[in-house]
Curated annotation (Swiss-Prot):
Function noted in UniProt: Reversibly transfers an adenylyl group from ATP to 4'-phosphopantetheine, yielding dephospho-CoA (dPCoA) and pyrophosphate.
Protein's name in the database: Phosphopantetheine adenylyltransferase
InterPro entries hit by this protein: Cyt_trans-like (IPR004821), PPAT (IPR001980), Rossmann-like_a/b/a_fold (IPR014729)
GO biological process: coenzyme A biosynthetic process
Site positions (Transition state stabilizer): H16
Organism from which the protein derives: Acaryochloris marina (strain MBIC 11017)
Subunit structure: Homohexamer.
Keyword Repeat: no
Cell compartments where the protein resides: Cytoplasm
Assigned EC number: 2.7.7.3
Listed SUPFAM superfamilies: Nucleotidylyl transferase (SSF52374)
Gene from which the chain derives: coaD
Main location: cytoplasm
Length: 176
């Protein structure tokens, strides 16, 4: 059985990697499909994201990497996959993902969505959070694969965030 795990993976986190590894244990083949979204300005190019994922998933023999720029369900049909694999971190994820699963099912009834609950240690983790921490010089080594942590550090040491700090004001003196 073929499963597609779609996402932007900008960048891949240990939470994503957890879902990928567990998916590879459940399905005969897992395709990690990196989305090309023209409406978003990603930190890393699609090629960089593919390379990041490839580097940290070399140990998974039944994994394939690909890109797509269509509806997820259309891509899944094209790849003749039977399953859309999704990770759930919190109840808020479930509400959105359930809506998407129903929509995808209405478009392609033979494709099932399988939800995997994220492992507890990654339940708070998102790519946006990782980028925010890295942007302000915090360590993300415990949140992303080692190769990604290095790339994030390189990215943000080249272009540190601009923070505008107002100049100090002179203390006011009381007038009589």
């Amino acid at each position: 059985m073929i499963a597609v795990y779609p996402g932007s993976f900008d960048p891949i986190t240990l939470g994503h990697l957890d879902i990928i590894e567990r998916g590879c244990n459940l399905f005969g083949s897992v395709i990690v499909a990196v989305a090309r979204n023209p409406n978003k300005a990603p930190l890393f190019s699609v090629q960089q994201r593919i390379q990041q994922i490839q580097t940290c998933t070399q140990h998974l023999a039944n994994l394939e990497l690909d890109t797509f720029d269509t509806l997820t369900v259309t891509y899944t049909q094209k790849r003749q996959a039977q399953v859309l694999l999704r990770g759930l971190r919190a109840l808020s994820d479930f509400e959105y993902e359930l809506q998407m699963a129903h929509t995808n099912h209405s478009l392609s009834p033979h494709i099932e969505t399988v939800f995997l609950a994220t492992s507890n240690e990654y339940s708070f983790l998102s790519s946006s959070l990782v980028k925010e921490i890295a942007k302000f010089g915090g360590s993300v080594a415990h949140l992303v694969p080692e190769n990604v942590a290095i790339e994030l550090e390189e990215c943000f040491t080249k272009t540190p965030p601009s923070v505008s700090i107002p100049p100090p004001t002179a203390p006011s003196t009381p007038t009589d």
